[in-house]
Structure formats: C-alpha cells, structure tokens
C-alpha cells in the first residue's frame, strides 16, 4: 500500500502549470502531518522542477533561467550559460540564491553561444514569458536545447505551459531529436486538461546555429498548426456532442407578448399568471 509520502509526491509531480503552490497547500491540509510532510517531499519537488523546466530569477536580476537535468551541478546547484552564473535552488519555494560566476568549460562553447543567440531571437519573437537554455551533454559530445513558455490566467481559471526539449550529436550532418509538450488546465466549474506530447526527429545538413534553430522553428510552427486543426475538429465533433441541445419548436416568438411568457416574467420580476 502506498505511503502518505508516495501519494503526496504524486500530487506534487502532477501539479498543473502555475498551480504548484495550490497543490502544496492542499497537501498540507489533507495530510495529518500538515506542513511537517514538506521536507519529505524534496525529491518530488526536484523532479517536478526539472521535468517541467521550472524557471527562477537570479538574485538582483529580472531575467528568468531554467532548472533542468541538463544544467544541474552537484547538490541543488545549476548553471546558466548566457549569464555565466551558477546558483542554488530551493525546490520547494522555487527561489534561487548563492549566485556565483560560472565559466562554461566545453569544446563546443562557440556553437553553444551561437545557438543561444539564434534561440533567443526565435523565443522572443514567438513565445511570451519564455526562458531558454543551451547546454553541453553526454561528455561534451552532444548539445541540449531547451525552451519553456508559461501563460498563467488564474482570474480566468486557466493556466498553460509550452515545453520543448531537443538534443543532437555534434557531427555534420546531424539529427535533432526531442519533443514538444503543451499542457493547459481549465478549471472554471469543472476540470479540463490538455496534455500533448509530440516526438520529433529532424535531419539537419549543417551544424550551424542558424540551420538548427530554423529547422526547430519550422517544426514548432507545423505542430502549432496541427493543434489548431485538432481544436477545430474537436469543437465540431466530440465537444459539440457534449453540449446540451435546446428543443426546436419552430414557433415564432411574439416579442410584444414576451412579458406573458414565464421567462419574461422571471427577467422582469413579474408574477406568473
């Protein structure tokens, strides 16, 4: 039988975009240990932040940086190539501290910096509230490209997150593999979640940053168009069948007598006849 920590951990790791704090509050309320259970959930918070590409602001900075398995150092420290900074993360509060200078030690440093420049231009053009990163992986024989964009609208009862993770070996020609994930949660008078996962396998003839990011941008645009078509099909198909159909009486409404109808009386506050 699953323990309380296991169950609470699954809640943490399944938190919708932008709603981790709400889930944490619910966990404290639902468990007999209350806030005392939170330290036991540290591994779950770490997995959530790395998987969801959580973002944090560096001390004294406004730009957000990524948390992921690809830029992880020892302990709870991570590094950001663009700002040349390493930092410590409190996975529960999603706050960064103890920032230090960090110099990228990679034989592919020039390629990584070029990719960051091209990726930054692409991200700023197409994704609001985004963060991105490029990191050496697999003993410096490959490169990982990460992009996340969050859109939170709790006043309208929805939150969403776009995540893209790519990697490719440093060879020419090369193949970029990865996936695009889109998660949206709508929770006004209900609970509807959209979770998509699109695997990608992209052939790139040149190892230049422009060629790689251009190929990625095309794949993301194509997937967005696929999603748009899927939404139209759902609206006209499955969702249409869920809507309550109003009866068809084929009778004209005599508007001058609308006050005599029950609906008209309800609206005007009159009494029924």
Swiss-Prot record:
Protein origin, superkingdom: Eukaryota
Q: Could you tell me one molecular function GO term of this UniProt entry?
A: actin filament binding
Q: Which InterPro entries match?
A: CapZ_alpha, CapZ_alpha/beta, CapZ_alpha/beta_2, CapZ_alpha_1, F-actin_cap_asu_CS
Where does the UniProt annotation locate this protein?
Cytoplasm; Cytoplasm, Cytoskeleton, Actin patch; Cytoplasm, Cytoskeleton
List the GO biological process terms: actin cortical patch organization; barbed-end actin filament capping; mating projection actin fusion focus assembly; mitotic actomyosin contractile ring assembly; mitotic actomyosin contractile ring contraction
The primary location reported for this protein is cytoplasm
Pfam families named among the record's database cross-references: F-actin_cap_A
Q: SUPFAM superfamilies per the record?
A: Subunits of heterodimeric actin filament capping protein Capz (SSF90096)
Matching Gene3D superfamilies, A to Z?
Answer: F-actin capping protein, alpha subunit, F-actin capping protein, beta subunit
* Disulfide links within the chain: none
Q: Which UniProt keywords apply?
A: Actin capping, Actin-binding, Cytoplasm, Cytoskeleton
Its cellular-component GO annotations read: actin cortical patch; cellular bud tip; F-actin capping protein complex; incipient cellular bud site; mitotic actomyosin contractile ring
The protein's role, per its UniProt record: F-actin-capping proteins bind in a Ca(2+)-independent manner to the fast growing ends of actin filaments (barbed end) thereby blocking the exchange of subunits at these ends. Unlike other capping proteins (such as gelsolin and severin), these proteins do not sever actin filaments.
Q: Give the quaternary structure.
A: Component of the F-actin capping complex, composed of a heterodimer of an alpha and a beta subunit.
Family classification: Belongs to the F-actin-capping protein alpha subunit family.
- The name this protein carries in UniProt is F-actin-capping protein subunit alpha
Q: Which organism is it from?
A: Aspergillus oryzae (strain ATCC 42149 / RIB 40)
Q: Which gene encodes it?
A: cap1
